[in-house]
Swiss-Prot record:
This is Ribonuclease P protein component. It comes from the Bacteria. PROSITE patterns: RIBONUCLEASE_P. HAMAP family: RNase_P (MF_00227). GO terms for cellular component: ribonuclease P complex. Consists of a catalytic RNA component (M1 or rnpB) and a protein subunit. Belongs to the RnpA family. Its EC number is 3.1.26.5. InterPro entries: Ribosomal_Su5_D2-typ_SF, Ribsml_uS5_D2-typ_fold_subgr, RNase_P, RNase_P_CS. RNaseP catalyzes the removal of the 5'-leader sequence from pre-tRNA to produce the mature 5'-terminus. It can also cleave other RNA substrates such as 4.5S RNA. The protein component plays an auxiliary but essential role in vivo by binding to the 5'-leader sequence and broadening the substrate specificity of the ribozyme. The lineage of its organism: Bacteria, Bacillati, Bacillota, Bacilli, Bacillales.
Amino acid sequence: MKKKHRIKKNDEFQAVFQKGKSNANRQFVVYQLDKEEQPNFRIGLSVSKKIGNAVVRNRIKRMVRQAITELKDEIDSGKDFVIIARKPCAEMTYEEVKKSLIHVFKRSGMKRIKK
């Protein structure tokens, strides 16, 4: 993901947690905060240490980033998202991760995601 599509700072994460709305399925929780003045969407990823060792956590983050890269044209701009991975995603394949992210994005009200 390009730098303009990332959330890195703790206060930006906290703003999305406190002011945003959340949607979830069994694998992911997605917090969403509207930022109309922002030209792009931004994504922050969080994978807890409860999920596995560093290898497993980094694998999950790589799969989520790749799915976001493939879906970037369909994700609404002007929004911040924080994606939190849950334990079941540790055993998922890339296709399952992508399908699960599409499902949770649709639940959050995104109309443009069609896959």
